[in-house]
Amino acid sequence: MKSEKETIYDYAAELKLLAFKEELECTLSLAAEENWNHLQFLTELLGKESARRRECRRRSRIRSAGFPQMKYLHELVMEDMPKEAQVILPELETLDFIRQGRNLVLYGNPGTGKTHIATALGIKACQQDFTVLFTSVPVLLTQIREAKSAKTLRTLQLRFEKYDLVICDEFGYVSCDKEGGELLFNHLSLRAGKKATIITTNLAFNRWNEIIKDKVLVAAMVDRLTHKAYLVNMTELSYRLKETQKMRQDK
């Protein structure tokens, strides 16, 4: 016949209470030492289970977001960042722009930390229970075209709309025709004024017509994406180049 403890382990396994199962012995000992009553014991044990599940959800959100690599805000060397980024980053770190459904556009030279900032904000958002999608504009446009061909575009749109934060990296690396520009504009417009989107681009707004050959569409896209948005000019000496120079000096 099973002991009460073994029975508890079985119930915990059946109910997928992993922390409950792992922490039972330790919590029983602590309860005996502290002379806890039953409610105190259960509160402690269920608190550990709740903490474990929150951590699992955070890891799952980060994994599902699709970040190409892990980047964190504390890794940024603030004095090496462009001036505008230094000023606005403390406000962005609060993630209020996500709660307010405001966009963030990081534009400027390659290697200045745009993707690092976007990724780091996305990871912090996942850690604070926001749902996040990281994608590049070329990949997103391919997905939109494929969904349209497969007649599943509305399904893709509904999923895209629901994320608390979408990060669209590398806007401007690949040009697109008028149809592609319209598809991208319509897709991004689904979130306008409701959910936050981060755009990283190496092109200033007056050069967007180099990748989308329709001036009217470009004007509409700029207007839609920048309305009440944070616009951060990252045009400065490459952040990556500065890191390389420092490494050489340290040798």
Residue ranges and their predicted role:
Residues Y9, A13, L18-P68:
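Interdomain "pre-motor" coupling segment immediately N-terminal to P-loop NTPase/helicase cores
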Residues R57, Q86-K162, I211:
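Conserved P-loop
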